[in-house]
Design a protein with these regions (language model features):
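STAS-like cytosolic regulatory interaction modules
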Residues: 1-68, 78-125
Length: 125
């Protein structure tokens, strides 16, 4: 896996979201750490859009260190998943925390976004 870049989003001088991007063959992995909310969705949305220009087979969002996800963060992921579909790619959320699984499940988006949802819908609950 080749690490491409690392970025952070600051709000009021405080780090809110950090990501690193790595690529392996036709998959791009975006590892998130921190909060995905109204203050951080725009930079992440731009990044995901830029990555889709490379036409990977999969964009995997590694959510293992994502501490918070609100409705704007969910919308960012849904929009990115739709954009990915439009270019023949799949966006999936990998290694989500229990809170991320719960929030996506409540919204009915676990089947759409979670990497293991199709093979085993109870695997992450």
């Amino acid at each position: 896996m080749v690490r491409l870049n690392t970025e952070e989003v600051l709000t009021g001088g405080v780090e809110r979201l950090r990501w690193s991007v790595a690529a392996e063959e036709s998959e791009i992995v975006v590892a998130l750490a921190g909060e995905l909310d109204l203050a951080t969705v725009d930079p992440l949305g731009r990044l995901l859009g830029e990555l889709l220009q490379y036409r990977p087979t999969t964009v995997a969002v590694d959510a293992a260190r994502l501490s918070f996800l609100d409705s704007s963060g969910i919308q960012c992921l849904v929009d990115a998943a739709q954009a990915a579909t439009n270019v023949g790619c799949k966006l999936v959320v990998q290694r989500p925390t229990a809170n991320v699984v719960r929030v996506l499940g409540i919204c009915g988006l676990d089947q759409l976004l979670l990497a293991d949802a199709e093979s085993d819908p109870t695997a992450r609950r």
